[in-house]
Amino acid sequence: MSRRRHSDDSDDSDGQPHKRRRTSEPSEIEERLESLICRVGEKSNSSLESNLEGLAGVLEADLPNYKSKILRILCTVARLLPEKLTVYTTLVGLLNARNYNFGGEFVEAMIRQLKECLKVNMYNEAVHLVRFLSDLVNCHVIAAPSMVAMFENFVSVTQEEDVPQVRCDWYIFAFLSSLPWVGKELYEKKDAEMDRLLSQTESYLKRRQKIHVPMLQVWTADKPHPQEEYLDCLWSQIQKLKKDRWQERHILRPYLAFDSILCEALQHNLPPFTPPPHTEDSVYPMPRVIFRMFDYTDDPEGPVMPGSHSVERFVIEENLHCIIKSHWKERKTCAAQLLSYPGNNKIPLNYHIVEVIFAELFQLPSPPHIEVMYTTLLIELCKLQPGSLPQVLAQATEMLYMRLDTMNTTCVDRFINWFSHHLSNFQFRWSWEDWSDCLTQDLEKPKPKFVREVLEKCMRLSYHQRIIDIVPASFSVLSPANPVCIYKYGDESNRSLPGYTVALCLTIAIKNKASNDEIFSILKDVPNPNQDDDDDEGFTFNPLKIEVFVQTLLHLAAKSFSHSFSALAKFHEVFKTLAESDEGKLHVLRVVYEVWKNHPQMIAVLVDKMIRTQIVDCAAVANWIFSSELAHDFTRFYIWEILHSTIRKMNKHVLKIHKELEDTKARLARQHKRRDSDDDDRSSDREDGPLEEQIERLQEKVESAQSEQKNLFLVIFQRFIMLLTEHLVRCETGGIDVFTPWYKSCIERLQQIFLQHHQIIQQYMVTFENLLFTAELDHHILAVFQQFCALQA
């Protein structure tokens, strides 16, 4: 940008180019400084140490003119580039050794930034800042006693009363997760105080509740790898680090090369730091469960993978997560950065990368980034390391398949999405015969179900015959059905069916581009099987009318999605009239299913379109999904895809109206502000009137939409409770094992609803607790609600 300005200036003919170039020079220098700081630590012909020394010299020379800019850049990289933490702490250490006042200003700026992050709930960035400050102790910028004092304030949060556990968790995590970097230094200077802090931490960890853990575990079984709660795992890693005399072997520590310079520098005390009090607006990070997939036995020939309670494992995983967070929008850069991770010859890097990517993909309640990003990232990694990474990925896929029986249903969904998408990029090549064990199992068991859903998804990304061709003939029982329309009026043998003649008339009329009125006229004579006298012009709920019309229209529009959408749009008025009642809406959905039961994707897109065009509403879709007609497909992937899409639409609708209300209130506030500087109060009053009326109308719309939203969740939870209770009673009276594949799927789908829509559900918790999740409910079902409540407790 600056180069373009320079060239434009030189073309000026008014004799001012030099003057204008000089005024743009500061911005060019600022851009250069930013580039130098951001790029330090990347691959270079020179050593990191000489680059840091050179950069420190450049920055020191520019401090008189660009101090505030340099401070701002350094604070930003401390927050946003944690994978280069020790590079930047060393740089700050060198600057502090050269300019003590700058070091003090930097520490104060970091504390201000930390307070601001905590104030606006940016807790992940705040952890990076705390770690950065702690590593400045190693660089002789911050005095160890003042860092210990800050950690004492952190740990004291666990003594606060009436605060959520997740608040205490965050402060304990911020303290413990800094110790791999600074534990040795703090212990050498303040061993008694550190022992006391660790003792208080242990006491807190022993008394904290862990009801939430089952809801967040990827697997229900702890073999071969325990699925530990994140603070428990970190505590074990810190305990081992302490036992090893705080010797950590993986963190890059460039400041050691400058020890003779840094140890001469004067140190700063941190300003007193009191954790901001808990408020209603505080939103703390949710607890996590640590994902484990590999250990040292999985790569016997390469470097040894650190153990799960080794602090090196924590450091490697943290850094890889940070790299993904910094570069996730650019898959090529992200893949290259992951593969050039420092010390990659000392660790089985490919195994660590694959494990970390799957840890994020399977993270509950939701991955940190959109799911498709992980697919594209793994494809990019396979391209960059074609000789090794695809083999590790295949090994991981095999492990995931083998552990499907105990895998969380939400994670199975993500596994299906990832694997089918991945296969589509590699000509759908896979050694399907290796999974032939699934063919001897009950089709409702996790393995055959997984293979069936993967092939179904692959068909969406290809076409039916291709999928039939790629899998062995023995897998035909799991192969997707031919996605053709089932039109019951198309066969002459069905002439005796009620409505057959009307269907023929409709077919001719629609082909001849009939209007809505003409369609109404044809449908008028269809008898209503639900009543003897059709005395209301024939447009109340008439299942036969709906059946004949919807069957015929969808059959004629079956060629493509766009043909079907056009048909819905053209005959929207007919749909709205026929589906005016709740029963009508439900029956429209039933007929859609009858016609397209062999094409789940078509069902999903048609239902989506019908909600958007208000032919059916969200509550009707929820009731349809839990109806007996869909019992056969209840555990199928597409059913839950439809339900979650329906809930998201409702949530977006509420948010949209709420935003309109807030925008209108803001406009009124701006008008009032203008009135204060305006003499004509009467004209202002006239302007206020319409806005105030609009706000009133929007408030009513928001309340109505929120009521619909709450009702949708009530319907869903009520139907879950009914289905699960029936199953539990049936098993109890029949002496059958409760934990069937159907039960596992159903109870985990209930968990999925809570987790995927947790922010919305939190708003209505009191209602749900009072009306549905009462103490009388079976403990199997109530446990899910209690686990959910514990997530933010």
From Swiss-Prot:
Localization, UniProt: Nucleus; Cytoplasm
Principal localisation: nucleus
Domain MIF4G: 30-242
Pfam families in the record: MIF4G (PF02854), MIF4G_like (PF09088), MIF4G_like_2 (PF09090)
Region (Disordered): 1-30, 668-692
GO biological-process terms attached to the record: 7-methylguanosine mRNA capping; mRNA export from nucleus; nuclear-transcribed mRNA catabolic process, nonsense-mediated decay; regulation of mRNA processing; regulation of translational initiation; regulatory ncRNA-mediated gene silencing; RNA splicing
UniProt cross-references to InterPro entries, sorted A to Z: ARM-type_fold, CBP80, MIF4G-like_typ-1, MIF4G-like_typ-2, MIF4G-like_typ-3
Signal peptide: none
Coiled coil: 686-716
Keywords: Coiled coil, Cytoplasm, mRNA capping, mRNA processing, mRNA splicing, mRNA transport, Nonsense-mediated mRNA decay, Nucleus, RNA-mediated gene silencing, Translation regulation, Transport
Basic and acidic residues compositional bias, start-end: 683-692
GO cellular component: cytoplasm; nuclear cap binding complex; nucleus
A molecular-function term among this protein's GO annotations: mRNA binding
Function comment: Component of the cap-binding complex (CBC), which binds cotranscriptionally to the 5'-cap of pre-mRNAs and is involved in various processes such as pre-mRNA splicing, translation regulation, nonsense-mediated mRNA decay, RNA-mediated gene silencing (RNAi) by microRNAs (miRNAs) and mRNA export. The CBC complex is involved in mRNA export from the nucleus, leading to the recruitment of the mRNA export machinery to the 5'-end of mRNA and to mRNA export in a 5' to 3' direction through the nuclear pore.
Subunit structure and binding partners: Component of the nuclear cap-binding complex (CBC), a heterodimer composed of NCBP1/CBP80 and NCBP2/CBP20 that interacts with m7GpppG-capped RNA. Component of an alternative nuclear cap-binding complex (CBC) composed of NCBP1/CBP80 and NCBP3.
Family of this protein: Belongs to the NCBP1 family.
PANTHER family: CAP BINDING PROTEIN, NUCLEAR CAP-BINDING PROTEIN SUBUNIT 1
Name listed for the protein in its UniProt record: Nuclear cap-binding protein subunit 1
Organism listed in the record: Gallus gallus (Chicken)
Taxonomic lineage: Eukaryota, Metazoa, Chordata, Craniata, Vertebrata
